[in-house]
Each structure stands twice: as C-alpha cells, then as structure tokens.
Amino acid sequence: MGTKTCISCGKARNTNKYSQNFKLKNGQPGFRNVCKDCDLLRKNKFISSTPYTYLTKVHTQSKSKRSKDMEWSITSEDLHDLWDEQGGRCALSGIFMTYGKDGNGSKEFNASIDRIDSSKPVYTRTNVQLVTYRVNIMKHTLTEDLLLWWCRNLIAKHDKID
C-alpha cells in the first residue's frame, strides 16, 4: 500500500484513505487526488448549502430506506415546495428548521419528512409535512392530536412543579 498527498488538506496518507476511481494502464488502481475525509467534508458542505440541496438528499435517502410496502410518490420538488409554503418553519412547532449536514449524526432542528397520518403507509404530497427532526422523533406514530395531548400534560405537570 502506497501513500499519496491530498490536494485539499495537504496530508500524506495511505492510499486506503482515497477512493479508487480508475485503473492505470498497467492495471494498478488509480486514486482520487482528494482523500475520503476531505471529499466527505466537501459533499456535506454542498448538501448544507441551501435547504433545497439538503431536501433533495433527504428525499433520496428516505426513499431508499422505506419499505417496499410503502407508497412513495413525493418528489424532491414537492419537498422544495413544502419548504417554501411553510416558510422554512416546522409544521407543528413553528420553529425555523435548519439544513446542516456535517457527518456527526442527526441535528435537532434539521428538516425531516413527517407523515401526517402515520397509520397510512403512504408518502404522498397530501400526507407529508416538514417538521424538525426532534418533533418527528417525538411524534413517531402518534396522531397530531395525541402528540399535542401529551405535550399539554407535560406542560401542566411542569407548571405544577414550578
């Protein structure tokens, strides 16, 4: 295994830290000029550059993760339209959503695709909304009414303690 210097970070690294993207005439592997770490940073920066690039990535990832039993008819353009219609705010909390991707896991305020009626196995334009990642985790399979009931009870209990 040889070493190669990344043109982005300037670090000399083992070639296993580079993506192979071609073969040389002698049959040996050819590697990209940018290491995998720098390439990932570049991709994440691009994905995080606008809400639309972020939502396009979310659409692609979400569609491929869903069960084959689920109907998926929304497009990335539908998500872009939802972002605009909602003014970049979470449909349930009204909080401004973020769209950052840095490779360090889920972000509390990032936009997330939520099925309005989780009992229906459909991702259609009329059954999805954009919410923050945290709100989507809290809602899970609950109806909106049941989620709000839980929230009111949590607040009532908290107010009694204060």
Regions found by a protein language model. Give the residues of each.
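Contiguous alpha-helical segments
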Residues: 1-92, 124, 137-138, 145-159
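Short recognition patches in nucleic-acid-associated and regulatory proteins
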Residues: 11-27, 98-119
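Active-site-adjacent loop/helix surface patches within enzyme catalytic domains
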Residues: 93-97
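Polybasic, low-complexity binding patches
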Residues: 100-105, 110, 116-129, 137-162
